[in-house]
Structures are given as structure tokens and as C-alpha cells.
Amino acid sequence: MNFNATFIGQMVAFAIFIYLTYRYVWPPIVAAMAERSKRIADGLQAADRAEKDLELAQKKVVEQLTSAKKEAAAIIDQANKRAIEIVEEAKLKAQQEAERVKASAQAEIELATSRAKEELRSKVVVLALAGAEKILESSIDQNAHNELVNKLAAEL
């Protein structure tokens, strides 16, 4: 192999090319690669954070659903208890009203019975007097008649 000036010139040109490449071309390439590597790493970290955040959010959702279900069950139980109380109150009021109506009806029956007895007494007295009058075929005077009516009414 022959070493001549061309070969040395090519070596010098190649050395200058390497120096210029190392000095001006290589730093932007390395910077771009470092930036890209950093973006990839940041993206992976963001994905990990997002995955953890998603897991936390899912746990919170499960906790909130459990809490809401418990609260709903408590509200339903409370509503059922209140409904039972309302039904019991209505039953009690209905029983009281029935007793009041029954007592009122009983009082009316007793009053009607009393009136019927009084009316029957007065009719019996009149009939007895009419019968006695026919038997005696004579008329009793008014004062004696009133006394006899009062006496018979008191006895009945």
C-alpha cells in the first residue's frame, strides 16, 4: 500500500469531518435523543401515575358505592319503620274512633229505649184508664185521672 499526499489529505479531511461532526452535528443529535428519552420516561411515569390514580379512583368509587348502599339500606329501614308506625297509629285511631262510635250508638240506643219505655208507659196508662173507664162505665174526674196516671207511671 502506498502512502502518498492524497492519502494524508484524505486522512486530514476525514479528521476535520469527524471533528466538525463531533462539534456541530453530534450535540443536537444527542440532545434530541436525550429529549426523546426524557419524554418517553416522562410518558411512562405519567402512565404509571395515571394507572395508580385509576386504581385509587376505582377504590374510592367502590367505597362510595358501598357507603351509598349502606346509607340507602338505612334510609329504607327507617322508612319501613316509619311506615309501620304510621300503620299502627292509624289502627289505634281507627280503634278509638270505632269505640267512640260504638259508645255513641250505645248511648243513642239507651236513649231510644228509654223514650220507648216512657212512651209505652204513657200508652199503657191511657189504655188502662180507658179499660177501667169502660169497666166502671163511668168517667173519672181530671184530678183523680192525673194522680192515677202519675202513680202508674211511677210504678212502671
UniProtKB/Swiss-Prot annotation:
Pfam families: ATP-synt_B. It is found in: Cell inner membrane. The keyword Transmembrane applies. One of its GO terms (molecular function) is proton-transporting ATP synthase activity, rotational mechanism. This is ATP synthase subunit b. It is a single-pass membrane protein. One of its GO terms (cellular component) is proton-transporting ATP synthase complex. F(1)F(0) ATP synthase produces ATP from ADP in the presence of a proton or sodium gradient. F-type ATPases consist of two structural domains, F(1) containing the extramembraneous catalytic core and F(0) containing the membrane proton channel, linked together by a central stalk and a peripheral stalk. During catalysis, ATP synthesis in the catalytic domain of F(1) is coupled via a rotary mechanism of the central stalk subunits to proton translocation. F-type ATPases have 2 components, F(1) - the catalytic core - and F(0) - the membrane proton channel. F(1) has five subunits: alpha(3), beta(3), gamma(1), delta(1), epsilon(1). F(0) has three main subunits: a(1), b(2) and c(10-14). The alpha and beta chains form an alternating ring which encloses part of the gamma chain. F(1) is attached to F(0) by a central stalk formed by the gamma and epsilon chains, while a peripheral stalk is formed by the delta and b chains. It comes from the Bacteria. Belongs to the ATPase B chain family. SUPFAM superfamilies: F1F0 ATP synthase subunit B, membrane domain. CDD domains: ATP-synt_Fo_b (cd06503).
